[in-house]
Amino acid sequence: MNDIYDLTKAIDPTRPVNDASGDGHIKTDIWAVHDYTREYDRLVANHTFKPGVEPYRNEPKKPFLAKYNGQPYMVDEMGGLPWIKESERSSSWGYGANIDKMEDFYKILEAQIDAFKACKHVVGICYTQLTDVEQEKNGIYYYDRTPKFDVARIKSIFEKIPSYIENPQDLSDWKAK
């Protein structure tokens, strides 16, 4: 992994390198984790930085992994809320229990977005996922790309997060070690 990171930087030193989506970091410019937690309080606790405590990790017990070094911190997989047709539930899955009421889906999604908005060190999130795939039914859209939900309502929930950072950290002297 170190060699691939170094080669990528040699080819294009301006390009940030994410060595492993969802943690497992060896050498990285972007600290990315996955968190499908649904509860606001747990998400805030997971992603609020505490002095002297390493940030949330998906793989905390692997001593060979890199330590957090001030990289931009992203949750590059969140959401994962399964909305599965009853006829497909035996052959499909999502992250966590299926959501039976559409209004519950919106409430959970909004709580997740509110939680990440409250976490000042989280500089980016990515909802998993845009569309259903063969066996994974976490999409905002069905496999055939038709919407499962009120897309305008989904958009309004995501628009609670600003599209820019009001007080960005000065990362001009930051480098991965």
Task: Enumerate the predicted regions with their spans.
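Substrate-binding/catalytic cleft of secreted carbohydrate-active enzymes
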Residues: 1-145, 153-157, 167-174
